[in-house]
C-alpha cells in the first residue's frame, strides 16, 4: 500500500525538487547575505512608510493617518499593521518559507504544475511547461521593478483556475475547497489589476463549460457546479472583505476614481465627464503600464523592440545590460527621428513629445 502510494507520488516529489533546485540556482545571489535585490517600487515604499514605521516603534501601535504623502492620506494605503490572517499562513506553506525572490518562482512553478495536472498533462511535460511559465522574461522584469504583489497574485491564478476545473469535472469536494482557498489566497496578495484579468479568463472558461453542458443536457450538473463556484468564491472574497471594502471606498477619492477636469484640454482622450470629473482612469494613463503594440511579440522574440536599461551592482561596480549598439534598430530609429525634429524645432519638450509620437515609440515599461 505504502509502496503504491510512493510510486504514484514520486513524479510529483521529483517535480517539486526540480522547481526548488531551478529556483535556487536562478536566484543564487539571494543566498549571499551581502547582496540585496534592488527594486525601485520597494525602495519607494520604504521611503513612504518610514514615518509610519518609526511612529509604530515609538508608540507601539500603528497610525491611521500619514502626513508625508499627498499632503495627508489614510495610512492603510501604504503601511498599517495587519491582523493575522490564514492567508499568510498558507502562503508561507505554499512557498516553503523560501527567501525572496526564490519564493516567487517556486510558487509560480507549483501553481502552473497543478493546473497542468488537472488538465491531464503528463507530469514530465507539466514540469517543462510550469518552468516556462514561471521563468518567462516578464517575471524577473516585474520583480526588478518591485511588483511583488503582482507576481504573487499571478502565481495563484493557475491554481485557482485548476480548482474551478475540478468543480466542472464533478470533483465537487476538492474543487469547492480549493476554489475557496485559492480565491482567498489570490485576493489576499492584493493586486486587483491581475484579479481583473483573472475574472475575464474565469468568465470565458465558465462560459465554455456552460455551453458544453447545455449541449449535453447536463443542466443538473451545471446548476450544482455554478452554485458551488459562487459559494466558494464568496468565501474567498469574505476572507479579504475588509481590505477590498476600504480600498473600494478610497478609490472614489483617488485618481482611479476620476480626474478633475478644469479645461477640455485636460481630458485628452475625451473620457466621459460627470460633475467635472472623468469617470474612472483616463485610457492614455492606464495603458502606459501595458505592453506596446510591437512589444507584445517579445513573448516569442526576446528583444524585438530593444531592451531595458537596468543595471546590476557587484563589488562596487555597476554593470549596464544589455548594451544598445550603433547597429540596433532602436538606436538607428531614435537618431533618425531626433535629428529630424531637432533640425526643425528649438523647443526641447516639444521635440521629446513629437519624437515619441512620430517614431511610434513603445511604452516606457520593459517587456524584453
Residue ranges of model-derived segments:
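Polar, glycine-rich mid-to-C-terminal structural blocks
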Residues: 224-291
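Aromatic-residue-lined binding/catalytic grooves and analogous aromatic/hydrophobic interfacial grooves
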Residues: 221
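Membrane-interface coil-to-helix junctions
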Residues: 22-112, 131-154, 282-368
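Start-transfer (signal-anchor) and selected internal transmembrane alpha helices
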Residues: 1-27, 224-233
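Juxtamembrane helix-loop transition sites at the ends of transmembrane segments
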Residues: 44, 81, 157, 208, ...
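Transmembrane helix-loop junctions in multipass membrane proteins, especially transporters and channels
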Residues: 27, 31-35, 170, 191, ...
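Membrane-embedded helix bundles of polyisoprenyl
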Residues: 19, 109-118, 124-213, 225-247
Amino acid at each position: 500500500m505504502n509502496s503504491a502510494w510512493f510510486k504514484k507520488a514520486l513524479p510529483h516529489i521529483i517535480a517539486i525538487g526540480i522547481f526548488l533546485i531551478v529556483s535556487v540556482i536562478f536566484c543564487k545571489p539571494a543566498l549571499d547575505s551581502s547582496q540585496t535585490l534592488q527594486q525601485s517600487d520597494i525602495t519607494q515604499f520604504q521611503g513612504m512608510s518610514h514615518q509610519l514605521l518609526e511612529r509604530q516603534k515609538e508608540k507601539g501601535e500603528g497610525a491611521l493617518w500619514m502626513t508625508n504623502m499627498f499632503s495627508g492620506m489614510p495610512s492603510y494605503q501604504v503601511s498599517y499593521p495587519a491582523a493575522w490572517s490564514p492567508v499568510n499562513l498558507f502562503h508561507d506553506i505554499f512557498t516553503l518559507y523560501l527567501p525572496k525572490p526564490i519564493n516567487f518562482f517556486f510558487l509560480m512553478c507549483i501553481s502552473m504544475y497543478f493546473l497542468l495536472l488537472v488538465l491531464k498533462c503528463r507530469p514530465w511535460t507539466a514540469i517543462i511547461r510550469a518552468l516556462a511559465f514561471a521563468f518567462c522574461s516578464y517575471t524577473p522584469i516585474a520583480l526588478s521593478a518591485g511588483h511583488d504583489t503582482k507576481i504573487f497574485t499571478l502565481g495563484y491564478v493557475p491554481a485557482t483556475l485548476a480548482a474551478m476545473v475540478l468543480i466542472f469535472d464533478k470533483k465537487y469536494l476538492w474543487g469547492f475547497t480549493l476554489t475557496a482557498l485559492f480565491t482567498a489566497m489570490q485576493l489576499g496578495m492584493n493586486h486587483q489589476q491581475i484579479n481583473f484579468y483573472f475574472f475575464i479568463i474565469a468568465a470565458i472558461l465558465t462560459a465554455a463549460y456552460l455551453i458544453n453542458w447545455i449541449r449535453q443536457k447536463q443542466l443538473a450538473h451545471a446548476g450544482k457546479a455554478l452554485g458551488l463556484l459562487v459559494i466558494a468564491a464568496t468565501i474567498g472574497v469574505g476572507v479579504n472583505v475588509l481590505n477590498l471594502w476600504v480600498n473600494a471606498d478610497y478609490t472614489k477619492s483617488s485618481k482611479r476614481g476620476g480626474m478633475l477636469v478644469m479645461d477640455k484640454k485636460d481630458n485628452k482622450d475625451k473620457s466621459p465627464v460627470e460633475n467635472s470629473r472623468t469617470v474612472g482612469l483616463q485610457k492614455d494613463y492606464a495603458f502606459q503600464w501595458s505592453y506596446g503594440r510591437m512589444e507584445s511579440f517579445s513573448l516569442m522574440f526576446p528583444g524585438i523592440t530593444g531592451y531595458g536599461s537596468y543595471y546590476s551592482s557587484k563589488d562596487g561596480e555597476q554593470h549596464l545590460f544589455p548594451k544598445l549598439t550603433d547597429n540596433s534598430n532602436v538606436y538607428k530609429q531614435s537618431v533618425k527621428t531626433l535629428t529630424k525634429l531637432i533640425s526643425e524645432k528649438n523647443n526641447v519638450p516639444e521635440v521629446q513629445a513629437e519624437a515619441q509620437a512620430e517614431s511610434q515609440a513603445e511604452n516606457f515599461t520593459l517587456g524584453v
